[in-house]
């Protein structure tokens, strides 16, 4: 099955032509270059530039380099059997990745330029490459300050299948940088995260103080947002716009309203007007400690809950000036002692020096084990083994209700009720339970945003109801006739019209690589797939798709360069090379696929390749492994039946053929082979029954052989 890239319509023209038609926050919402702030606020700007927020995003340069490129340039990642090298050439920074293939040769070599660094280095530094299309891709290797500074895999990549095409979404830059420019039209849901022109470097003043263009133009006479003068909720919203993430897991933890652009939130506005935050159901994953969970943990603390809105982020944190070391401990502990000096039980000695080490300890993040953060839960006793090292694990899918978390309570409005239903369905967490409410509310409200109908269509598809999915996607297209993403979705659930639908998609969105790719795969057209690659060569599935259609070794090599951890690409390589008689290389590829994911289908394909090389005993070993891995793989049972029959092991052969038929009763060729085996065993009646089934099948050649065998079985 072909998997299509997750991103929506790409405005895949060159970066420079996009600059003439951009949407920037400056032109829409009155933002300006924050360097102007330092003219009047020199001291504050200088202190802020040293904070983590001020150093959150930047181009790599000698002045901000903390890594030791000369001493430790290489890193080997054993889990994925891949090598990395970080290098500097002529003042430019690069990350190179490779593996070792047959005869010790380097394979799957990819080197990309590091255009930006995301992360101040307080917790980590992560490297971004900017594509010609203006997208940002996070490369797999990162740097962490632990143990004096060391290389390590980025979160989500310290696994057997690191992420080689981790695109940076708009929501990532929303919090890790100042306001960037994006192409006109990309404010809509599902738009690809394309950026235009030079990106700002670091979170700027306007993230908390709002648009500053008019303030600068009038030399300070026009007011800006002063968070300290907002209400308690308003002040918290300013912080929580970025620091609140109930979980990094696979739920809609921050559901942005569909009519809002990705950078449209203005400090001072109610955050709920921009997004609603969701959490797991009560009692599910309660004790997690995640990297971006500081505000989430803080809001669970007794100190916060019982303070009567007297405790907030600003009690401890001055965003303009972050203390370090002993000064930080003294400052934060002083805040604690405003309440707790007299509140401690009698006989408990309270030191003004340090409340933090015990009650807000450093902990490793569950979702980013290389990173260490402060625990804001403010617990009486520090959790055990808070800094113990552990291996990263792939997140487990969550199935169940997702519940509104912030604001609490969520205001009871029809629109908010609709978003609550969207949250159940949109990422597939609670589809069966959520769909009735989503359907009811949409019938009542008849929303005018196409995205609601995209969610509805996805829900019906998830439930196996293509008819209703078609109706939903068609309504999305009535509301937004040029929505190529809806056309692609419609083509998947209406295969009889898929070709004409996708032809329309590439007509209305000729620069959308995903439509060209889906169209090319449907029609087995190398030309259309190559068109998709030309529009955006960074979508990995396109190269594998081209190799599937053309059986080209060059396309296969490109697929594995783009993602050498794609087991499907390795398996495809094994099949292509087997066809060409290159068995040694083919078996290497099969073994790689199985090492990454030992699925029954990969083991079965390896067994077929071994048969082509006349290695029947080895083929039987792999076929048996395939059945152990996937007992429902009928083709593996069929193959085992043939291998047993070849050795004259008729009882075992019959058993495997029967297992295959039990799984797929209409396999005419298996009925034929089973009939032959049974006839050889002298079980004439049973043989005849299976031969008649084979004769009734749609395969003319099989039917002819079955009829011939039946004639031979007939009494003379």
Predicted regions located by residue number:
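Position-specific recognition of the canonical hydrophobic site in helix A of tetratricopeptide repeat
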Residues: 461, 495, 524, 551, ...
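Structural marker of alpha-solenoid helical repeat scaffolds
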Residues: 444-445, 479, 508, 535, ...
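Helix-start (N-cap) detector for alpha-helical repeat units in TPR-like alpha-solenoids
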Residues: 449-451, 484-485, 513-514, 540-541, ...
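Primarily the internal scaffold of c-type cytochrome electron-transfer domains
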Residues: 24, 28, 35, 43-119, ...
